[in-house]
């Protein structure tokens, strides 16, 4: 169950089992957010990981007892439908997805059967084999979410990831009006692909209880 709290200028929203973890999304001034996060974590438990703009999360880690900064990464989003032609399409199921992820992206947060992972899109080869995939996962009514991007090693360097991500982006923008994704800040190649699809980059971070 999603729950929300507010204190002064700060808002915290607890969402269980989102993108591999229990998440506590936080916005607002750190002076209000720190006592709010402290109280909320006492209520919901230490499994929830505060998430928000990097500067805010670093401030929370300095002010909330027992909370430590975990990692920074990128949040990218767009409300534009990409202008590209692609043969990518939604799969009828998830056959072959797990095997491709295991080979091409074993650290993916999105996997078939995981809570919130709704459907997979793919570009396929001549024999129907999966070449590049991406998922609609953890989407909310007003923001779709793209995850689980992977391309088979033999098919890399051909622009397939851009095509399948462009397809999913277009589908989610039409359905939710906005789409977002998370990306490692030290992955410039992926960031460049998403920028070409119209995404803008924002530095975010997560923290966790010791």
Where does each model-flagged region fall?
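Short amphipathic alpha-helix that is part of the acyltransferase structural core
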Residues: 72-108
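A conserved beta-turn-beta hairpin within the catalytic core of GNAT-like acetyltransferases
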Residues: 19-25, 138-146, 156
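Conserved active-site alpha-helix within GNAT-family acetyltransferase domains
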Residues: 55-68, 162, 185-203
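Conserved catalytic-core motifs of GNAT/GCN5-like acyltransferases
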Residues: 68-79, 180, 200-210
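Conserved beta-strand-loop-alpha-helix junction that forms the acyl-donor binding cleft
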Residues: 51-56, 153, 180-191, 207-210
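Conserved acetyl-CoA-binding loop-helix of GNAT-fold acetyltransferases
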Residues: 32-41, 151-153, 157-173, 191-196
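Acyl-donor-binding surface of acyltransferase catalytic domains
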Residues: 9-86
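A conserved beta-strand-loop-helix scaffold within acyl/acetyltransferase catalytic domains
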Residues: 109-150
